[in-house]
Amino acid sequence: MSTPLRPMSTGEILDRTFNLYRNNFVLFAGIAIVPPALMLVVQLIQAGMVATPGHPRATTAGFAAAGGIGMMLGVFAYLVGLAVAHAATVFAVSAVHLERTTTIGESYGRVKGRYGRVVWVIVQAALRSFLPAILVIIVAAILMPLAAKGGGKAGAALAGVVIGLAIIVAAIMGLVLYLRYALAVPACVLEDIKASAAIKRSVFLSAGSRGQIFVIYFLMGIISFIVTWLFMIPAAMLAAATAKGSPALAALFTGLAGFLAGTLAGPIATIALSLVYFDQRVRKEAFDLQLMMAAVDGTPLPGAQAASAG
């Protein structure tokens, strides 16, 4: 390996992220294209169900119910596709970072049979992180009317402030907890372990680097926002100029913009987090030495160390 694995700073991880993305653009964009394509299909189907002149059936209750069910199924398919693409991207990063070759098909093929496991990892991480915040919001929704009814305007105002602060604190706690599980998918994919074990591995590996992970999420969020609006603004202008009276055509323009933005920006955060995973294994488990001891190229990456069990 011409570039041995070594500990990297946040700046070096970001630099390596963009180098890998730029040098393997077709690979990463090709993997990332699946979820935006699924969402585009969902948006176009939904647009086709919007009431238009000459199509009164679009306003019937049965048609609306069918559209709602179709929309939910489409969103579910999109989320599953997003999880699978995330896993395939992780494998692709492991290959190119360790100077091996791979393709779009091979990256998806290597995670075949682990789709359900990856989805369950993501669901577990989300529930562990944000379920408390959701419960706080539900309690707030129940208490607000009671406070307004029993305490007058002053009591309602005070209750609103307290409940609002509780929701904010719960949301912040959820985000902090989510940082603990940011490396669960790389652990699941590259070490071929169960969802619960991947969650535990992420807690161990992310310890001491959660500030770094937060910075990466924050910067990648900004990049995604900018890329999205670079496509959305022209699409909205084009729709306003040419798609008057045609919701389907307007949805096509905005859907294509979202498709392009998702394909281009989607893989970047996953690349960065995969590199954080490698960095933490180098720091905590001397992963560079383990790798040099591997017998042949293509050998599965060495798994969890006993030290990570806690």
Residue positions per predicted region:
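Short, surface-exposed, polar/charged, turn-prone segments marking secondary-structure boundaries
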Residues: 16, 21, 48-49, 56-57, ...
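Interfacial aromatic "cap" segments that immediately flank transmembrane helices
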Residues: 11-38, 102-133, 163, 176-230
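Membrane-helix interface segments in multi-pass membrane proteins
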Residues: 39-78, 133-174, 225-266
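Generic N-terminal helix/loop capping motif
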Residues: 20, 24, 28, 36, ...
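Short, Lys/Arg-rich, polar N-terminal cytosolic tail immediately upstream
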Residues: 1-14
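Mid-bilayer segments of alpha-helical transmembrane spans in multi-pass integral membrane proteins
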Residues: 41, 76-88, 92, 96, ...
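Generic hydrophobic, aliphatic-rich segments that mediate packing or membrane embedding
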Residues: 13, 65-76, 85-92, 100-104, ...
